[in-house]
Regions:
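Alpha/beta catalytic barrel-like cores
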Residues: 1-96, 162, 205-228, 233-278
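Alpha-helical scaffolding segments of alpha/beta enzyme cores, especially the outer helices
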Residues: 26, 106-117, 151-155, 175, ...
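Catalytic beta/alpha-barrel core
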Residues: 45-49, 68-72, 84-104, 144-176, ...
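Distinct, well-ordered alpha-helical segments
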Residues: 57-59, 132-157, 173-185, 213-217
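Short beta-strand/loop segments at the ligand-binding rim of alpha/beta enzyme cores
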Residues: 63-69, 118-122, 183-207
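Hydrophobic alpha-helical segments and helix pairs
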Residues: 74-123, 127
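Active-site-adjacent beta->alpha loops and helix N-cap segments on the catalytic face
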Residues: 94-114, 172-185, 210-211, 243
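Conserved, mostly hydrophobic/aromatic
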Residues: 125, 166, 232
Length: 278
């Protein structure tokens, strides 16, 4: 995403990398401002890559904000960062060849096992893209996707992969979210479930939430077994583009990001308080 924001055509230069690292600090400042204005720090965490986000992680830990980093080329790339979570974005086909699945599940089991020993939990943002045959079998693409996600979680659990947090994009499969959440908690597992939102770069909303963000935030708040949101780069993409092009000042970008996060938090809390489920 940062290559897109900075319009980097090829391999990033050292100057490009420093610019990208600075933009990550802007996003963190937005989160920090939101926390200072009332979002409970115990309810938020920041997920960055270990390549450019070390300074952000250190500042987050100093504020007692939860931290997560992607493993990159292996577990060693995040061990030295002392993060609270190892974050993995994964598209998985539970019907793919057995040897392909076994290899991946073993890798995840290693991460999960390391987590048990080192008190670092996994965040798995999971998706599944159905094949034409799978769509045919289930009748439509959304029903196929929901069932593949459910089957994927079952396979991970059977393989001993213990994720502290599961995250899913609920668009199109809203009616299946309670089932996915129930599977994540099966047999008394203490996993938490998040719904992914703000992954749309096309809709330009600074302080206003777009329709998808409102819908998913309310869905998360009103669904038993769902604990919160995994907020994607759509919440700050346009602010960073405008900042990098000189259209807005740094402080304006930070405040806009903070307001966006505050609006989502307030909508979640208001919707949860009004829900008969809780």
């Amino acid at each position: 995403m940062y290559a897109d924001v900075l319009a980097i055509p090829g391999k990033p230069s050292s100057s490009n990398r420093e610019q990208a690292a600075d933009l990550k600090r802007v996003v963190f400042e937005g989160l920090r401002t939101a926390v200072k204005q009332g979002i409970p720090r115990s309810s938020v965490a920041i997920w960055v890559d270990g390549d450019l986000g070390e300074s952000v992680l250190l500042r987050a830990k100093a504020m007692s904000i939860g931290t997560s980093a992607s493993p990159g080329n292996g577990l060693e790339t995040v061990k030295h960062l002392f993060v609270d979570y190892i974050g993995i974005q994964l598209s998985f086909d539970p019907d793919s060849p057995l040897n392909t699945r076994e290899q991946l599940l073993k890798q995840l089991d290693v991460l999960s096992g390391s987590n048990r020993e080192g008190s670092i939990q996994l965040i798995i943002e999971l998706d599944s893209t159905p094949t034409a045959a799978q769509i045919d079998n289930f009748g439509n693409s959304m029903k196929a996707r929901a069932n593949l996600l459910l089957k994927s979680i079952e396979q991970f659990q059977d393989a001993g992969v213990n994720s502290g947090l599961w995250a899913f994009d609920p668009k199109g499969i809203e009616s299946y979210i309670p089932t996915l959440a129930a599977q994540a908690h099966i047999d008394g597992r203490q996993s938490k479930v998040l719904l992914s939102t703000s992954n749309d770069f096309l809709t330009r909303n600074f302080n206003e939430l777009n329709a998808d963000e409102k819908h998913i935030t309310r869905l998360a708040a009103r669904t038993h077994g769902v604990d919160g949101l995994l907020i994607g780069p759509g919440a700050y993409y346009h602010q960073l583009v405008d900042l990098s092009k000189g259209r807005i000042a740094r402080d304006e970008a930070i405040l806009s990001i903070a307001n966006h996060l505050i609006n989502m938090s307030e909508l979640f809390e208001k919707s949860r308080a009004a829900s008969p489920v809780f």
